[in-house]
Every structure is written in structure tokens, then in C-alpha cells.
Amino acid sequence: MLKTGGLSPSLCLLSLLLALHSAERSYPPPQRRFEYKLSFKGPRLAVPGAGIPFWSHHGDAIPGLEEVRLVPSMKNRSGAVWSEISVSFPSWEVEMQMRVTGPGRRGALGVAMWYTKDRDQVGSVVEGLASWDGIGIYFDSSSNDVQNGPAIRVLASDGHDLQEQFGDGTVRELGSCLRDFRNRPHPFRARITYWRQRLRVSLSGGLTPNDPEEVCVDVEPLLLAPGGFFGVSAATSTLADDHDVLSFLTFSLRDPGSEEALQPFTEKEQFHLARKLEELKARLALGTREDTILPLNSKAQEEGERFFNLEDTLSRQSQILQALQALSRQMDQAEKQWKQQLGSVVQIRPEGGWNTAKVSTLLYGQRTLIQALQEMREAAAQMASGAQVFYLPVGTKHHFFELDQTLGLLQKDLRDLVKMTAKPPRPSGWLPGFSTCLRTSIFLFFLLIQTVGFFCYMNFRQELDKRLQEYLFTESISLQPALPIPRTIGVLRRQPVSPSMQA
């Protein structure tokens, strides 16, 4: 009997690993296709007054033209954005750029990127989940351990778990790594790739614009069914940071060379398409502009695109220019009136001569006022020139509100100047700083007369009282001549003293 020797287990394991590695390297890179309905980026990230196309924002999220501020630097706030269209392809890749800035070494709760079965299930709270089905990549900046944070964690749930807290060592954490993404000089980039039931999270440091990417988490096998929704959320606690998302780009992945099979049209669809083709040919033959523009407009409405009304913007700018020109003319008139008044005051010169200090004060005040008017004119001219080239998008009412306030202030200042110039002319002998009140010498003269009269009256009153006392005393003596002296003295002691006698 012949015996054959088998391979050792170590050689079998090594050959298996080499086969897997060669098979993995033999796979060509997937073919990417940009999905614009699941993406957003600047510079026209949000439509003024309409939000982000194909996305919805919730909580304290603020869509802008360059970025989406999920949460401002305020305490106990939360916000999120969610895609309105579900993911219809099995494999995908997301490139996200974000910026988290704030004071101190510890940050707020952080940012989370979601792929869940139901949108708005997670909401805008990142520190706890209720019931959700999908995955979440959590950029945690609230770690108490500064040396071991911030951290990036990959979480998963099947929709049957109760509320769990991040960062406490739960079994739902598929992987994590430590990477500081706060207060970077450049936006922090994250690439999340799901391809062949494998989830890979790659990160760039944000120290330079072109930092190389490093793999943070690589999980397989992981089954994610299509039909989910993308979302990004953030929240703050007692510590506050600015959480901004600059771009969120989604790509669908498929094997290279594998094109989607075109299904044959049915007879009903062929008949419908043929009729549409005939209608289009008829419209093109007529060459009417309305018929050719109508399909474009309907298509734009279906795609959710919005066009700006340029005529309305130009009409508003023309009204602003007219108002500024009218203000400039009124300022010219006010300046001319002030110059005329200044010339008339200089020409009038009294006989006694001017007070040099008062005249210089008046002239300095008028020169200051004329200079202020000139500055107002220059400001109005700058506003007019800026309004000719500045673009105001329709729907931003705050620009026009600021312009209305500015025009109102200019009109108020102009009305005050007109009222000052409309005062009646002063007499020719009027001096600057001269008061029309009573002179000091006249006041002192009348005060002296009043004092002299008062003292004369008091002297006359004292003389009258003295004569009256003498008269009463002589009459009392003539009526009682026989009274003895001691008795008379006793009677006088018992009688009350009159006020006139006291005087």
C-alpha cells in the first residue's frame, strides 16, 4: 500500500491567507457614480428661503450658502439634516468635510453621521438613541479623558435595542479610534465606504489641505440593506462648540464593466413614447418659444430647482438708486443754504466789533457741520455705486430691511438739517452768543430800589408805632390823675404788655 503524506496545518493556513489576500488584491476598484440628490456642498449649498435641495433640516440647524451649521456655539442645543430620498443602491461611499471649533480642550457632545432605515428616527440627539436600525459613525468630543479623546466610534443597531449611551463599552460598538478633529486649521475629512459587505472609515488630520487618509475602522462582514436614509446630527451640553458640515458627497459603487441591464419596453410604453415623439416634432416644427420652454420649466420644477427673479431684483436696485440720488440732491441744497447763511453772518459786522472767540466757535461749528454733510454725501455715493454691482438674491429680506433702515436714518438727519435752516433770520445787530435776556446792571438797579424801599417802609413803621405808644401813654395819664403811685405801679404790673410797647 502506498502512503501519501499530507500538508501540515500551518502550511494550509498560510496558503489560505495568501489565497484570500491575492483574491482581495485581484478585485479591481469599484466604479463610482455621483449621486447629487444625496449630496450637498458650497458655494450654493442652500437655496435662500427654501433650504437644502432634497434635504430637510431640523432643530437648531442653520443652512447657509457655504456650510450647514448643525449647532451654534450655544448650550443645550441640537440640530440635524436628513436626506429626503432613500438610497436605492447596495454599495455606496460618502465623503464628508466638517469643522468643529470651540474654546478649551474639551468639546461638546460631537457630530454623528447616520445611515438608518427610517429617517428622523434618531432625531438630533447624539448622546442617546431610542430605537433605530442601521449604523452611526459618532465623532465624540465630550470625553472626560483628554488624553484618550476625541474618539471616532462606529455603532450598529437592529432596531430592537433600548436606549444606550455612547462610550461606555457597550457591545453595539463595532470599532473605534482616537483622532483629534477639533480646532483644525483645515476642514476635517472623513470617508465612509460600504463595499462588498465591508465598512471602512478613513480619516484625514486636517493639518494641511491634502493630508493623507488613514484607516480608522474596518469592519466585515456587515450587512446593510438598501433603502436607508443618510443624516448628520450634532448637539451641545454645558460646553458649546460650532459644528459645521461643509460638504456631504455621496457616490454609488458598482463593479467595473457591469452596466445595468436595460429592460425591453412593452407595447404600451412604445406607443406612449411614439406619441410623445410626434408631439415634440410638431412643437419643434411650429417653433413657438413657449412650447420649447414649457418642458424645461416643468422639468426644473420636478427636480426642485428654483430660479431667481432678476427683474424684481433690478427694479428694487433702481428704486434704491433713485432714493439715494434724491437724498444727495437734498444734501446739496442743505449745504448751499448753510453756506449762504455763513456768508450773510460774515458780511454783517456791528459797530463795536465782533467777539473773536465767539465768532471762531461759530465758524468751527459750521465747518464741522458742512464736513459732516460732505461725509454723508460720500457715504450715499458709495452706497449707490455698490448697489449697481452688488447682487441681492431674491428671498433675502434682511438686505432690504437694512437698506430701509439706512435710508430712514439719512432722511431723519436731513429733516433735522432742513428744520435748522428753516428758522427765522436773526436781526442784523445780533452777535453770536449774545443773549436777549435782562442785563445784569438793570437787574441790580431794580434790586437796589427794592431794598431801599423796604428799609424806608420799616423805618416808617417803627416811627408810627413809637408815636402811637406816646399818644396812648399821655391819654392814660390824663384820664387817671388821682391814682396813687404805688397802686398805679401795681396796675401796670398786672396789665399785659402790648406788642407795640415791646417794640
UniProtKB/Swiss-Prot annotation:
Pfam families: Lectin_leg-like
Tissue specificity comment: Predominantly expressed in the sublingual salivary gland, in the mucous cells of the acini, but not in the serous cells, nor in the duct system (at protein level). Not detected in the submandilar, nor the parotid glands. Expressed in the mucous glands, but not detected in the serous glands (at protein level). Besides the salivary glands, expressed in the Brunner's glands in the duodenum, but no other mucous or serous glands (at protein level).
Gene: Lman1l
Residue intervals annotated with topology Lumenal: 26-439
GO term, biological process aspect, one: endoplasmic reticulum to Golgi vesicle-mediated transport
Protein name: Protein ERGIC-53-like
Entry membrane topology: Single-pass type I membrane protein
Superkingdom field: Eukaryota
Keywords carried by this UniProt record: Disulfide bond, Lectin, Membrane, Signal, Transmembrane, Transmembrane helix
Transmembrane segments: 440-460
Lineage: Eukaryota, Metazoa, Chordata, Craniata, Vertebrata
